[in-house]
Amino acid sequence: MTDVDSKVVGNASLEHPVISEEEGAAAFARVMAQLKAQVGIEAYTSWFGRLKLAEYSRNLVKLSVPTAFLRSWINNHYGSLLTNLWKQENSAILRVEVIVRGMKRVSKAVVCGKNAAPVVLEEKTASSFLENYTEHSVRGVEAGIFGSPLDSRYTFESFVEGSSNRVALAAARSIAEGHKSALRFNPLFIHASVGLGKTHLLQAIAAAALKRLKPARVIYLTAEYFMWRFATAIRDNDALSFKEQLRDIDLLIIDDMQFLQGKSIQNEFCHLLNMLLDSAKQVVVAADRPPSELESLDLRVRSRLQGGVALEIEAPDYEMRLEMLRQRLKVAQQDDNMIVISDEVLQYIAKTILGSGRDIEGAFNQLLFRQSFESDLSLERIDEFLGHLTRSGESKRIRIEEIQRAVARHYNVSKQDLLSNRRTRTVVKPRQVAMYLAKMLTPRSLPEIGRRFGGRDHTTVLHAVRKIEDLVCDDQTLAKELELLKRLIGEQAA
């Protein structure tokens, strides 16, 4: 071992020598693929979609999640499974920890180069996060609000308006300003893909309403926080007090509705929603899909949410992307007036990055970082290090109906045949193929897929999936058909 290598291991940890970031990322991807296969797409998306690798050494794995609730849920329900999967990946692993990411943004996990000692970045523990969370909640109560803390950056003033979000913004302002007309679209349901500004808009409503209402009876909650508070209240025999707090409000704002899980929790939320709407209290909800597609939700909740107005925020156009970059530059220059980025560069990034606002933010942060040690960045160089973003647009979600149409057209049957009880060979095979593709290409659960295929049981869907999986190994014609259908469905959804 060289002197440099000795220093690397010594500085990292004698007990847990650090593995390179590339190795860690590859191992994490393999374990996550195994996890998804075991728990299913829906459970994986709900509970592990925001799981990140924080640290990976020879004997220790640290995974991070954004909330204490997620940490607790994963530890209680999937802790043993995670540990077993990591031990299958690396038999030397002794411990797998799930920690909570801090409120403040931190750099990525440990990086270990050949000629540089690794820096183990500080992560907040669950206990420190809970202390921080409690502090924020106390401040919220003093300001007239309890629940998830608000980010001071998320205001109407900092929200970039454009054609893709103008209607949603107008509705949000109307609610925040207390216009009587707002009750006409109650509840307001805002849906959009990741990174398009849902959370920003919801927190802007809460912040503006808090300033206007005296006393302020406004509650902003993520669905996860609602679940955690409800579970904690039941555990502490304080459910009645919790319900009373929620019912004595003027404005309820719920974010990430797609994560609301559990029959008893959904039942309680349904009662709360009915009570507030029947009392002409304003409700605002956001999710990553429209109410009709939240199939894990109780039918009564979905029905009530569909009774208001659902507005979609779409991906930003060029003008919006450019304005986001200009605003981001102004904020950065307030911290460091030596930062100089030409408008030509901002225009180039706005033209080439076609994804979400989060992609824009990521590109700008990359640019700032590179500029700190590469003073003269050409457009070619920028395109080089932003390549993973410049060619990534937000792909449209594939729907089961689109799969059914494509399969019916390919096999020359009707969509109604796929949903029927007909058992002829000419219908059974296309139906099984469509169910298989629905499982592979969408995040829907087996029961949800069964309902979309004429109200079938989830075991029927599982049988179809396994049947196609068995056949495709030996049937090259079927394998080619599946690849063709996947391509046609992808083109149809693009």
UniProtKB/Swiss-Prot annotation:
PROSITE patterns, sorted: DNAA
Binding site for ATP: G195, G197, K198, T199
Transmembrane segments: none
Record region (Domain I, interacts with DnaA modulators): 1-103
Keyword terms of this UniProt record: ATP-binding, Cytoplasm, DNA replication, DNA-binding, Lipid-binding, Nucleotide-binding
Source taxon at top rank: Bacteria
Region entry Domain II, spans: 103-148
Principal subcellular localisation of the protein: cytoplasm
Region feature Domain IV, binds dsDNA, mapped onto this chain: 372-494
InterPro entries documented for this protein: AAA+_ATPase, Chromosome_initiator_DnaA, Chromosome_initiator_DnaA-like, Chromosome_initiator_DnaA_CS, DnaA_C, DnaA_dom, DnaA_N_dom, DnaA_N_sf
GO cellular component: cytoplasm; plasma membrane
Region listing for Domain III, AAA+ region, in residue ranges: 149-371
UniProt subcellular location: Cytoplasm
GO molecular function, one term: ATP binding
Residues of the signal peptide: none
SUPFAM superfamilies: P-loop containing nucleoside triphosphate hydrolases, TrpR-like
Gene Ontology biological-process entries: DNA replication initiation; regulation of DNA replication
HAMAP family: DnaA_bact
Subunit comment: Oligomerizes as a right-handed, spiral filament on DNA at oriC.
Entry domain remark: Domain I is involved in oligomerization and binding regulators, domain II is flexibile and of varying length in different bacteria, domain III forms the AAA+ region, while domain IV binds dsDNA.
Family, as annotated: Belongs to the DnaA family.
Function: Plays an essential role in the initiation and regulation of chromosomal replication. ATP-DnaA binds to the origin of replication (oriC) to initiate formation of the DNA replication initiation complex once per cell cycle. Binds the DnaA box (a 9 base pair repeat at the origin) and separates the double-stranded (ds)DNA. Forms a right-handed helical filament on oriC DNA; dsDNA binds to the exterior of the filament while single-stranded (ss)DNA is stabiized in the filament's interior.
Stated name of the protein: Chromosomal replication initiator protein DnaA
Record organism: Bartonella henselae (strain ATCC 49882 / DSM 28221 / CCUG 30454 / Houston 1)
Highest classification ranks of the organism: Bacteria, Pseudomonadati, Pseudomonadota, Alphaproteobacteria, Hyphomicrobiales
